[in-house]
């Protein structure tokens, strides 16, 4: 069976851990879902705020193949170098990522970005039932973590959890607060244990339930790797609540993922916004980042959005 990059099993981290200053954990208090605790003080900074969403393609330690040999290794250095170059050129103020490993992996990425001129001191790591691949968000501004959303569901009489959970934070930006939701839905790889499409629909339904609870939020941005196309049931369950941004690259192409084995280009990565936040989006400057370095860094392309 062919294993895609999204499903190979990794191991523990090899990076050296550092202090946890600037990192936050989930708060499990029973606060209202639309009212995370306020920040201690307002922030100052320049507008527009630059946001990037990026699937990093296994920024973690795992079994990798080289000349028919298997060994436990971290993400190849040439891929990391390209990835860091892409991000430092984009200079995001807020960065949402998929396929990050442990806290040590997140620390490593944070340190490399800072060493190359991109300081994002605040971070949050989010996980679901997948013990290896997680989501994270890094920010120039302080992060407030919302109460953890429900990620439990039943399918075919069995209990499951969303593989990577729902990342839910609020960030006080210079133009006003924005609530960021991040997801990484089940991949399209077939598995014998369950129907992967049905699994993805259940995950999308949980996300839609969470969006419904938030209601008409004044500034909500949902991003991530949805592993599905825009007319799919999973995506349509989201567009009932939020509007997708029609991002394109400089050649007006919309694909965000390349599957080299089958030579297939797909749009799996999206950014959705609430009606009121859409008015703050600079559509002319928002786009899909495309460059030779992007192809070296990951099988996904990053999404770039400017918020006023």
Name these PLM-found stretches.
Residues 1-4:
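Sec-dependent bacterial lipoprotein signal peptides
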Residues 6-115, 125-128, 204-205:
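N-terminal, active-site-proximal structural segment of metallo-dependent hydrolase catalytic domains
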Residues 38-41, 68-74, 91-99, 125, ...:
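Second-shell loop/turn segments in exported
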Residues 54-57, 98-101, 125-129, 140-141, ...:
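Active-site-proximal beta-strand/loop segments in catalytic clefts of secreted hydrolases
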Residues 65, 174-202:
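Metal-dependent phosphoester/phosphodiester hydrolase catalytic core
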Residues 100-179, 185:
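Structured beta-strand-rich core segments of catalytic domains in phosphoester-bond hydrolases
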């Amino acid at each position: 069976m062919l294993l895609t990059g999204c499903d190979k099993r990794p191991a523990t981290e090899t990076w050296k851990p550092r202090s946890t200053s600037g990192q936050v954990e989930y708060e499990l208090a029973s606060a209202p879902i639309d009212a995370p605790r306020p920040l201690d003080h307002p922030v100052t900074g320049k507008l527009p705020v630059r946001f990037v969403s990026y699937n990093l393609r296994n920024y973690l330690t795992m079994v990798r193949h080289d000349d028919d040999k298997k060994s436990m290794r971290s993400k190849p250095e040439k891929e990391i170098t390209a990835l860091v170059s892409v991000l430092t050129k984009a200079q995001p103020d807020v960065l949402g990522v998929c396929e990050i490993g442990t806290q040590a992996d997140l620390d490593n990425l944070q340190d490399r970005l800072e060493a190359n001129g991109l300081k994002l001191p605040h971070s949050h790591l989010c996980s679901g039932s997948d013990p290896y691949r997680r989501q994270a968000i890094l920010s120039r501004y302080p992060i407030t973590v919302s109460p953890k959303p429900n990620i439990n569901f039943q399918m075919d009489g069995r209990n499951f959890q969303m593989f990577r959970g729902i990342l839910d934070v609020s960030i006080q930006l210079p133009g006003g607060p924005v609530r960021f939701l991040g997801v990484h839905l089940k991949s399209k790889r077939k598995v014998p244990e369950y129907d992967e499409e049905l699994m993805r629909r259940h995950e999308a339904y949980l996300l839609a339930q969470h969006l419904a609870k938030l209601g008409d939020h004044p500034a909500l941005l949902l991003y991530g790797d949805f592993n599905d196309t825009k007319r799919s049931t999973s995506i349509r369950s989201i567009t009932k609540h939020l509007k997708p941004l029609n991002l394109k690259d400089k050649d007006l192409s919309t694909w965000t993922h390349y599957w080299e084995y089958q030579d297939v280009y797909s749009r799996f990565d999206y950014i959705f916004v609430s009606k009121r936040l859409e008015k703050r989006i600079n559509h002319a400057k928002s786009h899909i980042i495309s460059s030779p370095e992007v192809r070296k860094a990951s099988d996904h392309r990053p999404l770039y959005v400017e918020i006023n």
